[in-house]
Structure formats: structure tokens, C-alpha cells
Amino acid sequence: MNEKKERIIKTSIRLFAKKGFAATTIQEIASECGISKGAFYLHFKSKEALLLSACEYYIGMSMNKMKNIEEDLAGKPPKEVLKKQIGAQFEDFRDHKDFIVLLLTENIIPENQEIKQYFYKVTMETDKLYRNALLVSYGEGIERYVADLSIMARGIVHSYMNVMVFNGELNIDAEEISAFIIERLDDLVQGLSRSALNPIVSKDIFNPMPAGKDQLLEDIQKVKENSTLPEDITVSLDVIEEELTQDKPRKPIIKGMLSNLAGTNDKEVERLRALILSLSQFDHKKSSL
């Protein structure tokens, strides 16, 4: 990443944390960076694109640090590795507090499918990292409860970070809190080993994210090419396809076209309709479509 792009990301995160994502304008970011608004658009096509790049920058850095710890401490006791990984998260909190504050205090994920998919992917990767670390640390005996234990471990870490956000005077040492959390995980594992209750969460809680816009556009093209469809269905698919290519698809139009597709006897059309509805930005429960 070039120096100017990195400066824009760091400046924007500081402004987002201070003013809020919605209230911060591109002009303010550009002015704070000492560049023109046009120069901003040379690096990012929108504020949402900037946010996605910022998430990839900071979260990617943190995930790489966690993986590097695992590699660097290969051969060390597994719980020591896990302790270092937990401590690294609190070090990241200290070093990149503005970004963590933004994540914890504001709903920063706008109606942008790329950002939602990115966060879903990161959540799956973090859960996988924790599950593997917990299994190696505590053995196969916890496998039945490993999904619940991963949720509890991540919940403890995030809860302490929340406390640190809302109490700015609280200064917690990363090594001290990571050792404390490992002891609490020991307690949880001991309790689970005696439990006769069924796990709350299944191992496969994270299903693949619904198809994104690019995949849907490809699927629409295939259906139009390979099916003999009535004209009204083809026109409706054309309109949906056109809307999906826009940065901000118009929901009322897509809603109307989805109504046109309802009740067809074509399995591929029905599958497409279900996929479009599965996109959270078009989910009727979330966006009144």
C-alpha cells in the first residue's frame, strides 16, 4: 500500500471515530490529508470503498500477527501460544484504538454487500483460529463444546475491550489480561468437562455467505442464455441486472421485479429470486423488500 493511501486511511479512521462514519464527509477527509477531493477519488471511489480498505488494512494486520505468533512459537506449549495471541489483540487495541473504537461503538457497516461479506469472512476466520487454538490447547475432550467455547473466549476479549473504550482511564496490561483470560478459559473447560448439557451452538454455525452481486450477475446471464423465458420474465431480469450494476441499487424497483418473478414454474428463475432475496440488502426482514 502506498504512503498516501495509508495516510488517507489513518486520517479517515480518526475522523470516523471522532465524528461518526455517516457525519464525516469526503471533503473533510481530503482537507485533513492536505489533498483535493479529486485526489481522494484517485485512491477510493467512495467513502464505503475507503471503509472497506481500512477494515482490510487494520484487520488484515491483526490477523497476520495472530498467524505469525502461531508460526514463530511453533513447538511452544499451545496455551502459551494462545495467551500470546490474546495479548496481541489487546496490543492492537492500544496501537490502533481509533479503529477499535469505531468497530465497537458504531454500526459502521452500511448497506454495502462487499463490506458485509468481508466482516462475515473475518468472523469465520477468527472463529476458526480460536477453535483450532482451543482444541490444541485443551485436547479433543472439548471438541463437543468447541464452538461454544470459541464464542465465550471471543466474547470475553471483546467485552474487556468494550470496558476499555468506555473507561478511557482504565489501563490494562496486555500480558496481565491475557494470563487472566487463559485462567478463566481453564475454568470454563473444567466446567464443560462436567456438563451433561448439550452444546448450544453446532460446529457448522457459519454457513457460506449468500452470493454477492458479481455472482448474481453471472447467474442472471446464464439463465437468460440457457432458458426460453416469457418476455416479461426476461425484461424483469434485465431490469434487476441493470440495478445490480449500480453502486446504490434502487430497492423499490428490485422489489417490483422480484414480484414479477414470483410464481414462475422455472426452477432457475426461482433459484435466482431466492438468491437475490438472500442478499441482506434485499432481505425483506431488513430492508422492507
Swiss-Prot record:
The UniProt record lists the keyword Nuclease: no
SUPFAM superfamilies: Homeodomain-like (SSF46689)
Alphabetized UniProt keyword annotations: DNA-binding, Repressor, Transcription, Transcription regulation
PROSITE patterns to which the protein is assigned, alphabetical: HTH_TETR_1, HTH_TETR_2
DNA-binding region: 25-44
One function term, GO molecular function aspect: DNA-binding transcription factor activity
Keyword DNA damage in annotation: no
Positions of the HTH tetR-type domain: 2-62
Pfam families xref list: TetR_N
Gene Ontology CC: protein-DNA complex
Designated name of the protein: Uncharacterized HTH-type transcriptional regulator YerO
Gene label: yerO
